[in-house]
């Protein structure tokens, strides 16, 4: 995994955790949790690709990995839409920058997961 991606995830999560969005802070905490979950999932897929022999063990261990993959793409799409929505409604420049970086990172991670999944199929 690219060290820039790791630092990007950590930076965005740290920035998001500092935001106070009033009544929507529960939603923000949910976004942070999903970001963390997405990072772990992407990392595990990347590791499976690195050990291509693990493809069969991945499939045997989890016969529903394609279903999980589909679910992760749905989560990514939801996060992208949520981040875009937040970006449109916020007027705070710190939050705008954070959400723009989060959006860029989500698009990069979506592409990485697609690449990993095609290698595993």
UniProtKB/Swiss-Prot annotation:
* Signal peptide (UniProt feature, chain positions): none
Pfam families recorded:
Flu_NS2
| Subcellular localization | Virion; Host nucleus
Instruction: From the record, give the transmembrane residue ranges.
Output: none
Motif Nuclear export signal — list its residue ranges.
Answer: 12-21, 85-94
Instruction: State the UniProt keywords alphabetically.
Output: Host nucleus, Host-virus interaction, Transport, Virion
BP-aspect Gene Ontology terms: exit of virus from host cell nucleus through nuclear pore
**What GO cellular-component annotations does this UniProt entry give?**
host cell nucleus; virion component
Subunit (UniProt): Interacts with protein M1. May interact with host nucleoporin RAB/HRB and exportin XPO1/CRM1.
Give the UniProt family note.
Belongs to the influenza viruses NEP family.
Question: Which HAMAP family does this UniProt record tie to the protein?
Answer: INFV_NEP
Described purpose of this protein according to its UniProt entry: Mediates the nuclear export of encapsidated genomic RNAs (ribonucleoproteins, RNPs). Acts as an adapter between viral RNPs complexes and the nuclear export machinery of the cell. Possesses no intrinsic RNA-binding activity, but includes a C-terminal M1-binding domain. This domain is believed to allow recognition of RNPs bound to the protein M1.
This one is known as Nuclear export protein
């Amino acid at each position: 995994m690219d060290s820039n991606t790791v630092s990007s995830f950590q930076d965005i999560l740290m920035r998001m955790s500092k935001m106070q969005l009033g009544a929507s802070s529960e939603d923000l905490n949910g976004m942070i949790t999903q970001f963390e979950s997405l990072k772990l999932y992407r990392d595990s897929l990347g590791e499976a690709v690195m050990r291509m022999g693990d493809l069969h063990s991945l499939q045997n261990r989890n016969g529903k990995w394609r279903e999980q993959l589909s679910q992760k793409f749905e989560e990514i799409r939801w996060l992208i839409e949520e981040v875009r929505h937040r970006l449109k409604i916020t007027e705070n420049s710190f939050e705008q920058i954070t959400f723009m970086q989060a959006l860029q990172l989500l698009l990069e991670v979506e592409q990485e997961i697609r690449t990993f999944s095609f290698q595993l199929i």
